[in-house]
C-alpha cells in the first residue's frame, strides 16, 4: 500500500493493495500487469488531488458554495478525462489482448513426442477404455509429466483416441498448464488484472462523485434532528447556470 494512508480514498483503488489481490502477482508477472498498476496509481493520485482541490477552494472568498462545487467538479472532470479514464481503458484493452492470445496458446495443438507406431498404439489403447477411464488415464499421464503418452493422444485428431473436440480442448489446456507453467501463470495474472480493472471502474466513478461532493439541503427540522432533505449535484447546478445565461447569448 501507499506509504501514506489517505482515508479519503477507498483502499480498493490503492495500487499496491489492488495488485496484492492478484494471486499470481510477483516479479515474474509484474511487467505484464504494469498497465493496471499505473492506472490504479493515477486514479489514486487524482482522487487525492480532487480532495485537496476541494479543501483549497473552500478558502476562496470570491466563490459561494455553488461556485466552489462547480470549480471542483470542472477540475475533477478535466483530470479524469485527460488522464485517468484513458489509462484505465488502455490497460483493460491491452490486458484483454494478452488474455485472448494466451488463451489460444493454452489450447493449441501439440506435436507427438513418440514414434508414429508407438503413438498409434497409445491412441488405440486409450480408445479401448471407457470414457471415464480414458479421461482419467490421460489426465494422470499429464500430471505425471509423461509427455510421450499425453502428446501421442493430443497430437492427433480427437476421434483416434475416442475423444470429442470438447474433451480434447479440456485436456490440451491441462497439458499446457503442466508443461508450460510460465504461460499459465502469466495468463492467470493478466486475466485477474483485467477483471480487477473492469470490476473496479464503478468504484472509481463513485469515488470521484464522493470527492467532488454535493450541496446538502437542510430539512425543516435540521436544527433538531440534523437531517437533510436533499442535495444539489454539480450537474443540476450547471443546468441552472446555463439556463440563466441564455438571455445573455449574443
Task: Report each predicted region and the residues it spans.
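Polar/charged low-complexity regulatory segments
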Residues: 2-45, 52, 132, 182-189, ...
Amino acid at each position: 500500500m501507499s506509504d501514506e494512508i489517505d482515508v479519503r480514498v477507498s483502499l480498493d483503488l490503492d495500487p499496491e493493495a489492488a495488485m496484492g489481490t492478484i494471486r499470481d502477482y510477483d516479479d515474474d508477472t509484474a511487467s505484464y500487469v504494469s498497465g493496471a498498476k499505473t492506472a490504479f496509481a493515477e486514479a489514486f493520485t487524482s482522487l487525492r488531488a480532487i480532495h485537496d482541490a476541494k479543501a483549497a477552494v473552500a478558502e476562496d472568498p470570491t466563490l459561494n458554495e455553488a461556485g466552489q462545487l462547480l470549480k471542483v467538479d470542472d477540475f475533477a472532470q478535466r483530470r479524469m478525462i485527460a488522464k485517468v479514464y484513458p489509462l484505465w481503458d488502455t490497460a483493460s484493452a491491452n490486458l484483454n489482448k494478452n488474455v485472448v492470445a494466451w488463451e489460444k496458446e493454452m489450447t493449441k495443438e501439440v506435436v507427438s513426442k513418440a514414434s508414429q507406431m508407438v503413438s498409434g498404439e497409445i491412441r488405440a489403447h486409450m480408445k479401448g477404455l471407457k470414457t471415464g477411464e480414458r479421461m482419467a488415464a490421460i489426465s494422470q499421464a499429464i500430471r505425471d509429466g509423461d509427455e510421450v503418452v499425453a502428446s501421442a493422444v493430443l497430437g492427433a485428431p480427437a476421434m483416434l483416441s475416442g475423444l470429442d473436440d470438447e474433451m480434447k480442448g479440456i485436456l490440451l489446456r491441462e497439458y499446457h498448464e503442466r508443461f508450460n507453467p510460465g504461460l499459465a501463470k502469466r495468463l492467470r495474472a493478466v486475466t485477474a488484472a483485467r477483471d480487477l480493472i473492469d470490476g473496479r471502474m464503478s468504484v472509481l466513478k463513485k469515488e470521484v462523485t464522493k470527492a467532488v461532493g454535493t450541496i446538502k439541503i437542510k430539512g425543516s427540522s435540521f436544527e433538531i434532528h440534523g437531517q437533510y432533505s436533499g442535495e444539489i449535484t454539480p450537474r443540476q447546478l450547471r443546468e441552472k447556470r446555463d439556463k440563466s445565461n441564455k438571455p445573455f447569448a449574443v
